[in-house]
Amino acid sequence: MKALYITSIEPFSGKTAVCLALGRRFKREGYEVGYFKPLSTQPWEPVPGRALDEDADFIRRTLDLPESTEELIGILLTPSLAREMRCGCTDRDLMSEVQAAYEKIQDKDIVLIEGGGSLREGVSLGLDPKSVTETLDVQALAIVRYHNRVNQGDDCITAYRQLYDQLIGTMINAVPRREQKLSEKICTPCLEKQGIRVLGTIPFQEELQAISVDELAEVLNAEFLTLPEKGDVLIERLIVGAMGVDQALPRIRRIAGAKALITGGDRSDMQLVGLEAATRCLILTGNLRPMPEVLRRAEEFGVPVLLVRQNTLETVEAIEAVFGKTRLGQESKLQRFEDLFAENFDLERLYDLMGLS
């Protein structure tokens, strides 16, 4: 059995996406694939009384794994466990529990282990990436999210110093296209000279930051006024319709990509302009229902309309808090990431390092 622990320097760097891309590829090549998450810090209750990890459940379903979601998680950090650990009211050996859970899923060819969202996550529990990789004796891939030319080097070196012998390599994710050649031709060789393997430099792709209408509705607790079946439509741009109608039409048309227009429910003039300008979704604020003509035209154009209770500012803030941080829940997004990953990640080198070839 081979195992690969996938961690990152900061949250929302692409760990789950890499687990899925590798998992689906390994399965296509005939390997029996397993998945394990030693520590989940964000319990999710799909039904009352049943706490799970949402990412683990998503991967279980996507990779069609036979285990229950509970079996894929070592420790689920519930509020009660967090309180017990803080006050020293428990004598549980969490690492032993992680080891026991991990042993139960080792009857695979390859196990992908989704680690912490940072190198310090779980340190107070003794379940940080360094401790887990050493205890389970597994190799680690560290994902660095690109911010600037300096941070990619700093973060790769930090991962190397923290994980050292366990580090199989690093991957730099979401690199702007204009920076990719410099990253590959200058930064990567510099890191390699220091003994830090850079296995991939994945370009930034705007489509992967998109959010679906269903996800918008969930975040905003919105009501569908039209076309709930269009919930899988992806939105790449947000436009706030606070300007005058005369300025709105040319401005909205100039903005590329799939757009959602956020405007007051009483702004029927702006709503109709948005529909004419090929927006993909209308988000109406203030819990004010639009005129019937707006809903009729939205149906004609195939545009879902969401009604939210919040005002426009609150709505924008709520969406911005999650924009670019949603999982690859749509097959089109997942397939696009897989393509980028295959084109820009040295899979042959990874296979050699893992002893798969």
Provide a role label for each language-model segment.
Residues 8-9, 38-39, 72, 114-117, ...:
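Fold-independent oxyanion-binding glycine-rich loops
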Residues 74-79, 89-92, 189-209:
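Ligand-binding beta-strand-loop-alpha-helix segment within the catalytic cores
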Residues 104-107, 250-259, 274-278:
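Flexible, charged surface loops at secondary-structure boundaries
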